[in-house]
Amino acid sequence: MIVSVLFIIFVGLGGGITVGAGFVAFLTVMGIIPRLMQLTKTMRFVQAYEAAVILGAVCGGWETLHMNHLYLTKWIAVPVGLLAGLFVGMLAAALTEVLNVLPILAKRIGLRSKIIILLMAIVIGKIAGSLFHWLYFIDHS
C-alpha cells in the first residue's frame, strides 16, 4: 500500500515537473511573451508578465488537483471571461506571428496579395465557432 502511494506521488510529481518545464520552455524558446509585450507595447511590465505566468501555472495546477468551484455572478464572470479570451487571442496572435504562419500559408495557397481576407476568414470562423459552442452546446447540455 505504501509503495503504491509513493509510486503515485513520484509519477505525479514527475509528470507535473515535465509539463511545467515544457510549458516554460515553450514560452521561452518560442519568444511568445516578449513578442506579446512588443505587440502590446508593454515592455515595462516584464515582472508582471512573469508573475502572471507563474501564478497562472500554480493556480491552474492547484485548481486541477482540488477542483474548487468559483460561484461568480454573471456580472463578474462575463468580464473575467472576456479578459481571458482577450489574453488567449493575443497569445495566439503572438504565436502565429512568431512562427510566421500566415505569410507562409498565404504563399502556399496562392493568396499572397489577399492576406487580409485570409486573416478575416480566420477571425470570423473563430467567432462563429465560439458563438456556436456557447449558444448551442452550453444551453443543450
UniProtKB/Swiss-Prot annotation:
Major localization class: membrane
Transmembrane stretches, start-end: 7-27, 45-65, 75-95, 115-135
InterPro entries registered for this protein in UniProt: SpoVAB
UniProt subcellular location: Cell membrane
Pfam families recorded: SpoVAB (PF13782)
Domain of life where this protein originates: Bacteria
GO cellular component, one term: plasma membrane
GO biological process, one term: sporulation resulting in formation of a cellular spore
Keywords carried by this UniProt record: Cell membrane, Membrane, Sporulation, Transmembrane, Transmembrane helix
Membrane topology: Multi-pass membrane protein
Name of the protein: Stage V sporulation protein AB
Organism of origin: Bacillus subtilis (strain 168)
Lineage: Bacteria, Bacillati, Bacillota, Bacilli, Bacillales
